[in-house]
From Swiss-Prot:
One of its GO terms (cellular component) is 3-isopropylmalate dehydratase complex. NCBIfam families: leuD, PRK01641.1. Heterodimer of LeuC and LeuD. This is 3-isopropylmalate dehydratase small subunit. The lineage of its organism: Bacteria, Bacillati, Actinomycetota, Actinomycetes, Acidothermales. The gene is leuD.
């Protein structure tokens, strides 16, 4: 997982609320178990509309998604996070997230930032009037900055540390590889092992 400290990019305003994981990536796209190849399924139904925000040329290459309240509700599917990342998003900002989606996002390296709805609406207005507006999401200072605006956000220290170190669950486990090997070496041979034969 790539470490995340500070990211400056352009934002795309998704003025929709109650976006569930099936809208993020429909079930028909869930036939893979790798983390790549999902960009084509991201918001697949909505992208059929030429006027959909991701189809508009002024938002091409934007890597911060600014969504309405209740983003990522519905069924638990890591594929929703993978699709957003595969499309190029590093950050999703919303007033509220589905709990499971937010947990999956943060564990997978996609920063899910909660800002008050009024702050999200103000950010929408700015990026709609000037899509080239740089937006900085600073995990070190826990701030979102754009134009002359600075907004703080909350994130627990442990999750923040994991993101800044670039550690997913596998990365955390691998940090203890020597201790795991030492434990396995001390176990009786007749017990199950995690070591390769």
């Amino acid at each position: 997982m790539e470490p995340f400290t500070t990211h400056t990019g352009r934002a795309v305003p998704l003025r929709r609320s109650n976006v569930d994981t099936d809208q993020i990536i429909p079930a028909v796209y869930l036939k893979r178990v790798s983390r790549t190849g999902f960009a084509d399924g991201l918001f697949a139904a909505w992208r059929q509309d030429p006027g959909f925000v991701l189809n508009r040329p002024e938002f091409a290459g934007a890597d911060i998604l600014v969504a309405g309240p209740d983003f990522g509700t519905g069924s638990s599917r890591e594929h929703a996070v993978w699709a957003l990342q595969d499309y190029g998003f590093r950050v999703v900002i919303s007033p509220r997230f589905g709990d499971i989606f937010r947990n999956n996002a943060l564990k997978g390296g996609l920063l899910a930032v909660v800002l008050p709805e009024s702050d999200v609406e103000a950010l929408w207005d700015v990026v709609e009037s000037d899509p080239a507006t740089p937006v900085t999401v600073d995990l070190v200072t826990r701030e979102v900055r754009y134009a002359d605006v600075v907004r703080g956000f909350d994130i627990d220290d442990y999750t923040r540390w994991r993101l800044m170190e670039g550690l997913d669950d596998i990365g955390l486990t691998l940090r203890h590889a020597d201790a795991i090997d030492a434990f396995e070496a001390r176990r009786p041979a007749w017990k199950p092992t995690t070591r390769a034969s």
